[in-house]
Amino acid sequence: MDHPSREKDERQRTTKPMAQRREHCSRPSGSTSSGVLMVGPNFRVGKKIGCGNFGELRLGKNLYTNEYVAIKLEPIKSRAPQLHLEYRFYKQLGSAGEGLPQVYYFGPCGKYNAMVLELLGPSLEDLFDLCDRTFTLKTVLMIAIQLLSRMEYVHSKNLIYRDVKPENFLIGRQGNKKEHVIHIIDFGLAKEYIDPETKKHIPYREHKSLTGTARYMSINTHLGKEQSRRDDLEALGHMFMYFLRGSLPWQGLKADTLKERYQKIGDTKRNTPIEVLCENFPEEMATYLRYVRRLDFFEKPDYEYLRTLFTDLFERKGYTFDYAYDWVGRPIPTPVGSVHVDSGASAITRESHTHRDRPSQQPLRNQTASSERRGEWEIQPSRQTNTSYLTSHLAADRHGGSVQVVSSTNGELNVDDPTGAHSNAPITAHAEVEVVEEAKCCCFFKRKRKKTTQRHK
């Protein structure tokens, strides 16, 4: 009489583990039975290499190709979800444009959304530090010519960028054929300026909430005007002068409140004549700023005219476009020391969220900057998420000490997050790659066997 009961118990004991295994195999992302966190079928999540308002940035590895990747994790229950929108913009941009990171995967990972992207090199801000915070005219022109093409491509896909700053422009990884290419990253603040339904330009509006980084944003953005293509180009012009001068006249302003300081930045920017800003530099720099500031809200910029301004100046100076940037030949810091570069190659808030003057508690990244630079503060109204997946702007805007006014509560990941127990789990390194725990920049790695690279023409 007891045999049927024993057989039933035995079936229950054997079928339960099998059901659990089927559940695990059908799960697209999450922790495996060995405790390894996976994103999608083939991306293994490793140590934490950065964090920001969006959540965490993790080092990852493609188990099929042994290539390292960057993985952004955002809580699914975030009050201001951002990652899927950024992924959609990357898909809208496509893979045809030069200087855009590859996006490998987007999907759930336990309690988080995850986006897997190409791992790139250091940012222009990192390299600016390396070059004693001044770039030569040749380097700035090589950067400017490339970034005008990047922005033209972004605009051709019906997007405006709205987040110009040196931290968002990265070179490729050392030893990679794209190491000389300036990449544009982080489309968390981008916006469609062509209505996808009507195919018409968005209307001109005023009293808009501020979007961008105060140091570089256009004058019209300070005035609360809706941004369009012209504002991206003006912000680029301010960044070019930052590289040439080493600083901008509206840095380091004093005020009692963040709101007043932000107002002072805009006032100083408006009251600084272009001739003064560009004094002692080629006239083409002033011509560029005059042109972009005179553009109409709806007007399509003449990108070729602006590029020709710089290419003609480049040729008149007798420069060769050999990608011999100022940082070439300098030891570039990596997570495992320095790599000597072969001389042969080389935010704010969305409109739907209210602005709150609450500074971020994130530390400044660069601990070696001068005390004067550390003492400078700018208001950087918060974006929904701090969406850089590679390097510098995971923390507050460095050197200038920009304060992020946070309007979302994403914060860091909870202590009980599924990756927390495995953040230090080693990733089996390729023979040529080493990874250490304390990484100043998460975008590049020291190669043990130095590969010779040819100069890119």
UniProtKB/Swiss-Prot annotation:
Positions of the UniProt region annotated as Disordered: 1-36, 350-384
Domain of life: Eukaryota
Presence of keyword Transmembrane: no
SUPFAM superfamilies assigned to the protein according to its UniProt record, in alphabetical order: Protein kinase-like (PK-like)
Main location group: cytoplasm
Location of the protein in the cell: Cytoplasm
Enzymatic class: transferase
Residue stretches of biased makeup (Basic and acidic residues): 1-13, 350-359
Enzyme Commission number(s): 2.7.11.1
GO CC terms, sorted: cytoplasm; nucleus; plasma membrane
PTM annotation: Autophosphorylated.
InterPro entries for the chain: Casein_kinase-1_gamma_C, CK1_Ser-Thr_kinase, Kinase-like_dom_sf, Prot_kinase_dom, Protein_kinase_ATP_BS, Ser/Thr_kinase_AS
Pfam family, one: CK1gamma_C
Phosphoserine: residues bearing it: S343
Subunit architecture: Monomer.
PANTHER family linked to this entry: CASEIN KINASE-RELATED (PTHR11909)
Role noted for this protein: Serine/threonine-protein kinase. Casein kinases are operationally defined by their preferential utilization of acidic proteins such as caseins as substrates. It can phosphorylate a large number of proteins. Participates in Wnt signaling. Regulates fast synaptic transmission mediated by glutamate. Phosphorylates CLSPN.
Record protein name field: Casein kinase I isoform gamma-1
Recorded name of the encoding gene: CSNK1G1
